[in-house]
A protein has these predicted regions:
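Selected alpha-helical membrane-embedding segments in polytopic membrane proteins
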Residues: 2, 28-128
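Transmembrane helix-loop junctions and nearby membrane-interface residues
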Residues: 80-88, 155-158, 181, 212
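A general structural signal for short secondary-structure boundary/capping elements
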Residues: 71, 183-188, 212-214
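Juxtamembrane boundary at the C-terminal end of a transmembrane helix
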Residues: 203-215
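Short hydrophobic/aromatic-rich motifs at helix boundaries and adjacent loops
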Residues: 20-24, 91-95, 146-150
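Hydrophobic alpha-helical transmembrane segments and adjacent short intramembrane/lumenal linkers
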Residues: 120-205
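Short, non-transmembrane cytosolic segments of multipass membrane proteins
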Residues: 2-37
Length: 215
């Protein structure tokens, strides 16, 4: 066998399969990105109609957390990591430590969404709504969509305050979804959403404070 043949990269089904797999994964990522943006737009533009569609979707809690929340929850820590590097904030900490913090933030964010869903379900009786674990997790996951997407502003730290508008959007979206998914009375939906948001904010502060102690 000649030296040229030895240096020739393999041209077989395995190589082609890897290329096809990469293309398939890229296409799937694009579809998922389009779905997330479409859902966020629908929840802000026509929340009642979008919540009705969400209610009809046949899914599971793990699928919501892994398939929808996990990719979204990665946006804030990844953008913060990039923003820190661009603005030289990484000089104050080791890159490895910054990466660990980003991963912990991501995991805690997913856990916080699940906790929020549990809270929505637990408080249902207080606000004359119906308990439903799956619908409560849908409320938590999709209401937090604007908050996760606002993480892109971490790319330029001086714009962090814009993320506060995402909190207002979260309350608005949740308030419109509670009557649809949890059958909450219209006149109690806003106080329901506000109570859940405040409790989740407190829990988030505690969880992220504990997470920061780990690193």
């Amino acid at each position: 066998m000649s030296a040229d043949n030895e240096n020739t990269p393999p041209k077989g089904p395995r190589f082609n399969l890897n290329v096809e797999d990469a293309k398939a994964r890229a296409q799937e990522a694009m579809r998922k990105s389009e779905f997330i943006l479409s859902r966020a737009y629908g929840l802000l533009r026509e929340p009642k109609k979008e919540w009705e569609q969400i209610k009809a979707e046949d899914t599971t809690v793990p699928h919501i957390l892994i398939g929808y929340v996990a990719p979204l929850a990665a946006i804030p820590p990844v953008c913060d990591l990039i923003g820190s590097a661009l603005f030289n904030r990484l000089l104050t900490i080791e890159p490895g430590e910054a990466l660990v913090r980003a991963v912990i933030t991501w995991v805690v964010s997913i856990g916080l969404v699940y906790f929020l869903g549990v809270l929505v379900n637990v408080l249902a009786d207080t606000f004359d709504a119906d308990r439903n674990e799956l619908n409560a997790q849908k409320i938590a996951a999709y209401s937090l969509t604007p908050s996760f997407l606002s993480g892109v502003f971490s790319l330029w730290p001086p714009l962090w305050w814009i993320s506060l508008f995402a909190l207002a959007a979260m309350v608005y979206i949740m308030h419109r979804g509670l009557p649809v998914l949890m059958k909450a009375p219209e006149d109690r939906a806003l106080s329901y959403a506000a109570s859940v948001t405040i409790a989740a904010a407190v829990a988030g502060i505690v969880l992220f404070s504990l997470a920061s102690c780990v690193t």
